[in-house]
Amino acid sequence: MISMEDQDFSDCSIIMINLDGLRKDRIQKCPTLRTIKEDNIYFSKMISVSPYTLAAHHSIFSGLYPSQNGVDAYYHMFRFKEDIKTFTEILKEKGYFTKADVISENIIPKRGFDEVG
């Protein structure tokens, strides 16, 4: 397994677009998304670790299964473990400005973001 903490991202701009509930076959119907897909890195075989958004997104940000990161059930949805470092925290440590544009701030772990809105 490759650790993000050991990587040099100094020449990279990173934009992560996560659209909850978007079927991948619909990307071709949207010219903007189609262009982004064709001109950048696109992960075509992603499989969700959870059937609901909160656990799935917290797993994306932590790199851990819901049972490991603490967001493993509807009743534990806001108990993201404090000792887990998110990839946004790692990017911030590497000098990145990190920003999230989300409908609900509860959807993602806020740690490591300079701005959430």
For the regions a protein language model found, what residue spans apply to each?
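Short, solvent-exposed turn/loop segments enriched in Gly/Ser/Thr/Pro and often Arg
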Residues: 29-30, 40-64, 78, 100-112
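Catalytic-site neighborhoods of secreted/periplasmic enzymes
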Residues: 64-117
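Short linear motifs at secondary-structure transitions and domain/linker junctions
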Residues: 35-36, 55-56, 73-74
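Active-site-proximal N-terminal segment of extracellular/periplasmic enzymes that hydrolyze or transfer
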Residues: 1-50
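Residues that flank catalytic or metal-binding motifs in active/ligand-binding sites
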Residues: 10, 56, 94
